[in-house]
């Protein structure tokens, strides 16, 4: 990235303001303070859903404790759209998991889920 540094003018020198912060060199765009945080979250999400093969990002965002509960609505939507299976989120496993197995397939850390479906999967339960 080429940063254009203008020579500091007399007022800038007086104030001790670096050339880059001068108003005549406008920053590309003023982001609200929460934007960096939001981008970090999105980057993390895309990292977790990368290689998913389905591009179904929203489903992965279940909290770890949501394992045992019935994920109402999510399954219904999927069945309506004709998608019965999703990919396992565990690296190197990548097996197709039925949408009812949300614990295993979709939550970020569902240790009991791993243990429960270990037979049917290449993945190992996380060491606790």
From Swiss-Prot:
Catalysed conversion reaction: L-histidinol + 2 NAD(+) + H2O = L-histidine + 2 NADH + 3 H(+)
Top-tier EC class: oxidoreductase
Region (Disordered): 21-84
Keyword Oxidoreductase attached: yes
TM region positions: none
Keywords carried by this UniProt record: Amino-acid biosynthesis, Histidine biosynthesis, NAD, Oxidoreductase
Molecular function terms, GO-annotated: histidinol dehydrogenase activity
Record-listed E.C. numbers: 1.1.1.23
Pathway(s) the chain acts in: Amino-acid biosynthesis; L-histidine biosynthesis; L-histidine from 5-phospho-alpha-D-ribose 1-diphosphate: step 9/9
Composition-biased stretches (Basic and acidic residues): 34-50, 72-81
Example GO biological process: L-histidine biosynthetic process
Family stated for the protein in its record: Belongs to the histidinol dehydrogenase family.
Role played: Catalyzes the sequential NAD-dependent oxidations of L-histidinol to L-histidinaldehyde and then to L-histidine.
Protein name: Putative histidinol dehydrogenase
Biological source species: Azospirillum brasilense
